[in-house]
């Protein structure tokens, strides 16, 4: 998505700060220290947050993170970004192969949409990918969580229009305006 935006003319540097198996609570603990090093010195910034799937995975018969803690963690990140003048965008957890995880991720996604709505933060729901045959086949053919290229292209198709609108409205002018 960032590469496509650069190709469309946005002068953009993207930092992926994901850590495998990190939950929203883990991200909330470390996000500020990691982003403050990168987002400074007068440029325009934005924070894209995509968490939640690791929260809904069962461990010992329970989700790794309760929905309430997940929502509080995301709210804390969004409030911290807002306090620093950094616009935020949230991408909901995508569906996987496990039906229980799909249902829990969809419920969490609805909660995340609410957290974002209260803060006027754009939110991208990815739950519709559960009905996308390409996404479903690619996730099933892999590790049950991650698709390959065609699946990620489906995810990007959901995120990209919202991301570009967010860039233009909140982060930086569109290439045509600069």
Task: Report the location of each language-model feature.
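Conserved beta-strand segments of alpha/beta enzyme cores
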Residues: 13-15, 87, 120-122
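Surface-exposed alpha-helical segments enriched in charged/polar residues
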Residues: 36, 75-79, 110-114
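Active-site segments of SGNH/GDSL-like serine hydrolases
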Residues: 50-57, 78-108
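Catalytic His-Asp segment of secreted/periplasmic serine-dependent ester chemistry enzymes
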Residues: 94-178
């Amino acid at each position: 998505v960032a590469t496509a935006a650069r190709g469309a003319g946005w002068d953009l540097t993207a930092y992926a700060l994901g850590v495998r198996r990190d939950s929203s609570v883990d991200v909330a603990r470390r996000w500020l220290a990691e982003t403050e090093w990168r987002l400074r010195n007068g440029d325009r910034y934005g924070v894209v947050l995509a968490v939640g799937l690791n929260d809904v995975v069962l461990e010992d018969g329970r989700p790794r993170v309760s929905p309430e803690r997940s929502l509080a963690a995301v709210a804390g990140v969004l409030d911290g970004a807002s306090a620093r003048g950094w616009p935020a965008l949230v991408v909901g957890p995508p569906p996987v192969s496990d039906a229980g995880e799909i249902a829990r991720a969809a419920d969490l996604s609805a909660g995340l949409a609410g957290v974002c709505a209260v803060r006027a933060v754009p939110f991208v729901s990815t739950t519709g990918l559960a009905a996308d045959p390409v996404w479903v086949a690619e996730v099933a053919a892999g590790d049950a969580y991650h698709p390959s290229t065609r699946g990620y292209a489906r995810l990007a198709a959901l995120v990209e229009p919202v991301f570009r609108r967010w860039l233009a409205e909140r982060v930086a002018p569109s290439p045509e305006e600069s």
